Amino acid sequence: VEQVHHISPDLVDFPGIKYILENHVPLALSDRSKELILKCRKYLDEKLAQAETPIYGINTGFGSLHDRSISRSDLGTLQKNLVISHACGIGEEVPTGIVKLMLFLKIQSLSYGKSGVHLKTVERLIDHYNSDILPVVYEYGSLGASGDLAPLAHLSLPLIGEGEVNYKGAKRDAAEVLREHGWTPIILDSKEGLALLNGTQFMSAFGVYCCLRVFKLAELADIIGAVSLDAFDGKIEPFHELVQKIRPYKGQINTAARFRKILEGSELMSRPKNHVQDPYSFRCIPQVHGASKDAIDYVSYVFQNEIN
């Protein structure tokens, strides 16, 4: 079992995420990610110090207030207010497993050094992940436009000592849990609130979770279908490789190949059959399972890109 997973610029994939979650592998930033985060923050500070014109979201207001200049002394307050003002989610609480996945994906996103956050901010997110101090996030509030603003605001509240967390089976004030761990609330600097809220880690966490579940369900569907065909004393001919080549859909071809692999060596399958053909529900399995797999492949492709 991997002792620590070092977050790096390398692409993350579904098997890797599954392994980390199932084995409760703690996170740490790689040296390369630390370097990228520090470099980006340095660039932003230098850019801000030299700026003669407003930079949106950094020394200006947001949205319709984009033409409102913000003084240097108020830049941190602007970011804090942004987080607090967007923490307006409603509905049921998001399951803690999804929230932990949100944390992982937000950490991964910030680790690329493209967002301008301070290193300490990312490290505090890692502290929350590793300690299972999971922010309370609500199901409704995201439009998915410039990001999952409301859910990510709730995810970010505990960083600044606000909001609530689920910790050791109880919902508690974040400030209280932070004090118990000796963690000082983060004082957000320019652009940090914007970086924390802009992102798709809420919808992506649900998407990754669903993909991991459906990968397993698709695998089980093939196994159940193959065993059922065997028990029914069915025919293997509809699963022949040449049949699939007539309509060369990837999912259909792979499903038929998987059935042939599962049923290889079956005594029932190899004995002569007296019936002409099996029920349609058996014969069309490659087409039905295959179409489902093609859809799964597309959805997982989209989420794979989104989380990287």
What are these regions (language model features)?
Residues 56-70, 74-78, 85-110, 138-160, ...:
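FAD-binding core of FAD-dependent oxidoreductases
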Residues 93, 113-117, 219, 291-302:
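Alpha/propeptide regions of enzymes that mature by internal proteolysis
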Residues 229-308:
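Accessory "access/gating" subregions that flank catalytic or transport cores
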Residues 114-140:
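FAD-binding glycine-rich core of flavoenzymes that anchor FAD
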Residues 1-52:
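N- or domain-start disorder-to-order transition segments that initiate the globular core
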Residues 151-260, 264:
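Mobile "lid/hinge" segments at catalytic clefts and subdomain interfaces of large enzymes
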Residues 17, 82, 86, 98, ...:
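Short alpha-helical scaffolding segments that buttress acidic/His motifs in well-ordered protein cores
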Residues 11, 15-19, 23, 68-98, ...:
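Glycine-/small-residue-rich beta-strand-loop submotif within the FAD-binding core of flavoenzymes
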